[in-house]
Amino acid sequence: MCLAIPVRIEELLDEQSAVACIGGLRKTINVALLDDLKVGDYVILHVGFALQKLDEAEARRTLALLAELGQLAEAEQAAQGDAS
């Protein structure tokens, strides 16, 4: 099962790609679907694509909920593989 997870933008590479922190690892992701991204923004990541921006509070709530459900590690592993 693939989950979309919140990730933090660490570096903007160009209009289509950025580096995000996924479970403590830095991975290049596709951000072509979003406008006006800045370093520090949080996005929803699914199969290597940033789909939507969200605020930090919502990102933290979502990550905490996934961790509580025991699915965060699985989602991060899937995202790390997809973002390569």
From Swiss-Prot:
InterPro entries given in the database record: Hydgase_assmbl_chp_CS, Hydrogenase_HupF/HypC
PROSITE patterns from the UniProt entry: HUPF_HYPC
Gene3D superfamilies xrefs: 2.30.30.140
A single BP term in Gene Ontology: protein maturation
GO molecular function list: carbon dioxide binding; iron ion binding
Biochemical pathway: Protein modification; [NiFe] hydrogenase maturation
Function: Involved in the maturation of [NiFe] hydrogenases. Involved in the biosynthesis of the Fe(CN)(2)CO cofactor.
Family the entry assigns: Belongs to the HupF/HypC family.
Annotated protein name in UniProt: Hydrogenase maturation factor HypC
Species: Azotobacter chroococcum mcd 1
